[in-house]
Amino acid sequence: MSAAEGPLVVGVDTSTQSTKALVVDAATGRVVASGQAPHTVSSGTGRESDPRQWWDALGEALSQCGEAAREAAAVSVGGQQHGLVTLDARGEPVRPALLWNDVRSAPQARRLIDELGGAKAWAERTGSVPSASFTVTKWAWLTEHEPEAARAVKAVRLPHDYLTERLTGEGTTDRGDVSGTGWWASGTEAYDEEILARVALDPALLPRVVRPGEVAGTVRDGHGLPFSKGTLVAAGTGDNAAAALGLGLRPGVPVMSLGTSGTAYAVSQRRPADPTGTVAGFADARGDWLPLACTLNCTLAVDRVASLLGLDREAVEPGTDVTLLPFLDGERTPNLPHSSGLLHGLRHDTTAGQLLQAAYDGAVHSLLGALDLVLDADADPSAPLLLIGGGARGTAWQQTVRRLSGRPVQIPEARELVALGAAAQAAGLLTGEDAAAVARRWNTAAGPVLDAVERDEATLNRITGVLSDAAPLLERDAASR
């Protein structure tokens, strides 16, 4: 390992499946060491993890970083959003954490929306309309289904809060992650006491919300990790806000993340409040906002179509009027939760490669619809679209996004954007810089830029028309088919 030019910092990404740690040179952004360790998620009706696994995985990831981790002057944790971590008086988990993708609280979400004045009222108060992924609905589920466990709870945390507190001994969170709970009012930037009372959650059980740029605490003795006592600990944040930091996003720059599900977001200086619930009105980690919309069918759905056709995922062919809507898991944007995949326009001369291209087109059409919803009037329509996530490395994804968006497309070379964003936040504690400015200095968004091409309006209009004509069929639930 060559000598670092500046102090070292650690950025952590505790995701659903694993915890990753990067040791980064605060002066240059160079990653000098990295480590990763897995954790498990329950199967069956719920999705749960023991938070102590996250701590153990953090220790293992840091041990893989070697001596570099011991030299770190600051650390920050980014993590999966929405999870409900319940702790007893000793700081031990009362039960496994309910993760973001545990949707058993869907009935509680519907009831809470009705009880507090409907979707519009929720959006105006919290920036979002709560779904079963939100923490507030999970707490409501817990109090109904496991009342003894709920009574034993002495602290409620989010996943990144849990690791931060084990480092510092202090209960803290940040505005980016807490904005996904459903009990933080985005208008006042404070806990909403009426919502908390409605779900019987004592505000005293919640962590202090640390301001952007504020030190959350320092590493305490007895933690068993390679950090020295007194190492600075930043507030940390949720994974999407951390990735935005990792890209050094400026307001109005669009991001499209291609994973199992698709995500579109952009930093905005306007507080979002979408009464339809399609756009989540999250805060970012700096003082602005991070409106975000998701699609359910992205890389996994298109790969499934490729598999059914016996093709490699890159084996697309142009020149077809066929429309394929790959809604294999229902769809969120557009809001068609009961839909299934739909094929229209098949002809004798349609090839397998054209069918695969149609699947890409259908998935990207949904993502661009999501992107249109999150970009505000101040966004620059000519700004390059940042393409991240596993699918961003695929040529077929790149070219489809380019053709249907009509924008330049930039593919950042940096991969671990959540951990990089956390590292930038940690570096900002040392230098006094804004974390996004640190990432821009590190040039984390650098990567090839594909020039804009003429937007394929014919394909977009055709897919929009099929969606409209097929709406009665797509909106039916399975039982009525």
Swiss-Prot record:
SUPFAM superfamilies: Actin-like ATPase domain. Pfam families: FGGY_C (PF02782), FGGY_N (PF00370). Substrate binds at residues 81-82. It comes from the Bacteria. The keyword Acetylation does not apply. The active site is at residue 239. The record marks 13 as: Important for activity. Its EC number is 2.7.1.17. It is an enzyme of class 2 (transferase). It catalyses: D-xylulose + ATP = D-xylulose 5-phosphate + ADP + H(+). Keywords: ATP-binding, Carbohydrate metabolism, Kinase, Nucleotide-binding, Transferase, Xylose metabolism. GO terms for molecular function: ATP binding; D-xylulokinase activity. InterPro entries: ATPase_NBD, Carb_kinase_FGGY, Carb_kinase_FGGY_CS, FGGY_C, FGGY_Carb_Kinase, FGGY_N, Xylulokinase. GO terms for biological process: D-xylose metabolic process; xylulose catabolic process. Belongs to the FGGY kinase family. Catalyzes the phosphorylation of D-xylulose to D-xylulose 5-phosphate. This is Xylulose kinase. It comes from Streptomyces coelicolor (strain ATCC BAA-471 / A3(2) / M145). The gene is xylB.
